[in-house]
Amino acid sequence: MSRFWSPFVKDLVPYVPGEQPKLARLVKLNTNENPYGPSPKALEAMQGELNDNLRLYPDPNSDRLKQAVAEYYGVTPAQVFVGNGSDEVLAHIFHGLFQHDRGPLLFPDVSYSFYPVYCGLYGIAFEQVELDEQFQIQVSDYSKPNAGIIFPNPNAPTGCLLPLEAVEQLLQANRDSVVVVDEAYIDFGGETAISLVDRYDNLLVTQTLSKSRSLAGLRVGLAVGHPDLIEALERIKNSFNSYPLDRMAIVGAAVAFEDREYFDETCRKVIDSREVLVEALTARGFEVLPSAANFIFARHPSQDAAGIAARLREQGVIVRHFKQGRIAQFLRITIGTPEMNQALLDAL
């Protein structure tokens, strides 16, 4: 702590990112990265930007990327916002759309741990709504005064999916609140809520290119919703950083959306590997929650989760252990290649 800090800084509880180990030999199954590389066409497009044009600023509106997203989802570019990773997009949403006096912001008690961090940063009152015994969202629990609602779908870190019909029920019950569906993992088994944005002006859907499109190192995220909501995010962005995406990010992300064949192929590989891993872990006595993500959430009835994680690490396999409350005995395990998954099973 320094005497030069603004007063609120000492009260912040920052987000703790997942470990990024330096040893290349480790089997890394802790941060939900895609085990398959980016689209070769996207890599080629990014390499094409390594020229004298790097002396020039990128397009502040990222029009090439917005057009690619709009065409992919059947919306207009005016309904698309892009930013430097979905975390930045979410930060702008919290800053620009959730500061109201109608009640607290609502989100699940087991959810993305960045949400309370944003609330602390922007001074937003919030309430964590308890998931049921199966770690599922109950729509009726969100029928109370609120400043907005946000939840991951599929949820993180559980992987559980809220069906699109239930998402629509939530929207209908909260027409005067912004409802944000955080779809970081939607491509591994869910149906996007983007199909609902033309019917609900209170819906905002966020996505990332870090998971299903294998571009975690590029830092690109997006939001799709009513143009009025997008305008609010643009106003926040242009009051903070008018150039959030560089030239390589814009073109690489755009081509990643355009290369549908590669996207479909790699998503299918992850989904197939997930089902094989779930079956193998279940046979070893683990309880595995239903997952629609590129990870699974599992516990063993007779083995301590922290102990399992430590033993795996000793054998060169890293998984994520959350120590808090009702999930303290669960491990979150990223779906790797078949070889990576087998290394996990061998280590167990």
From Swiss-Prot:
SUBUNIT field: Homodimer.
Catalytic reaction equation(s): L-histidinol phosphate + 2-oxoglutarate = 3-(imidazol-4-yl)-2-oxopropyl phosphate + L-glutamate
Family according to the record: Belongs to the class-II pyridoxal-phosphate-dependent aminotransferase family. Histidinol-phosphate aminotransferase subfamily.
Cofactor(s) this protein cannot do without: pyridoxal 5'-phosphate
Class of the enzyme per the UniProt entry, highest EC level: transferase
Lineage: Bacteria, Pseudomonadati, Pseudomonadota, Gammaproteobacteria, Pseudomonadales
Pfam families found in the cross-reference section: Aminotran_1_2
Biological processes annotated in GO: L-histidine biosynthetic process
The encoding gene: hisC
Residues modified to N6-(pyridoxal phosphate)lysine: 211
Listed Gene3D superfamilies: Aspartate Aminotransferase, domain 1 (3.90.1150.10), Type I PLP-dependent aspartate aminotransferase-like (Major domain) (3.40.640.10)
A single GO molecular function term of this UniProt record: histidinol-phosphate transaminase activity
Keyword field: Amino-acid biosynthesis, Aminotransferase, Histidine biosynthesis, Pyridoxal phosphate, Transferase
Enzyme Commission number, as recorded: 2.6.1.9
Residue intervals passing through the bilayer: none
Source domain of life: Bacteria
Protein name: Histidinol-phosphate aminotransferase
PROSITE patterns, sorted: AA_TRANSFER_CLASS_2
Cross-referenced HAMAP family: HisC_aminotrans_2
Pathways per UniProt: Amino-acid biosynthesis; L-histidine biosynthesis; L-histidine from 5-phospho-alpha-D-ribose 1-diphosphate: step 7/9
